Amino acid sequence: MSRDLPAGATPHTAQSVVNAVQGVAPAMEIADDRNADYTQLARLGLYLVADNAWNEGAMLGRFDTRWTRWLTTPEVSADDGLGRLRGEVFINGASVGGGQGRDLMGHPLKALAWLANEANARGEQLHAGDVCILGSLVSSKFPQQGDVLRFELESFEPIELTIT
């Protein structure tokens, strides 16, 4: 984040958070599901995200600070370049899923606005320097020791992680 996103007179929107984003990068989140009851996720999933409940860490690729070139429509849209950005995850060379930026609540900036508003509702805020993981293009995977995970996000260098 390039600047704080405090509560304001009106809620944050995808359009209003554009200037708060310093850069965009591919990421793989390391999660610990703590033996969760997956039947409850449909009801509680967004709150788990807002609470950072399962995050054990993340592997980040190179940040692109010229990311606004993907905003190819006058308003933030699922059809702009960021909404159409494609990514795919591989385990040991086999594809295990993929998606597009629009899979993150309709657009990554909509996910960021939601996160900022949720933080504000709790009396908190996103801060300059924060790194925000906004969602996933694939469902959770459960790699085993020795597996090699690779995330390929269009226009970025791939990132790779070996489970030891």
Segments the model singles out, each with a brief description of its role:
Residues 141-164:
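Charged, cofactor-coupling segments
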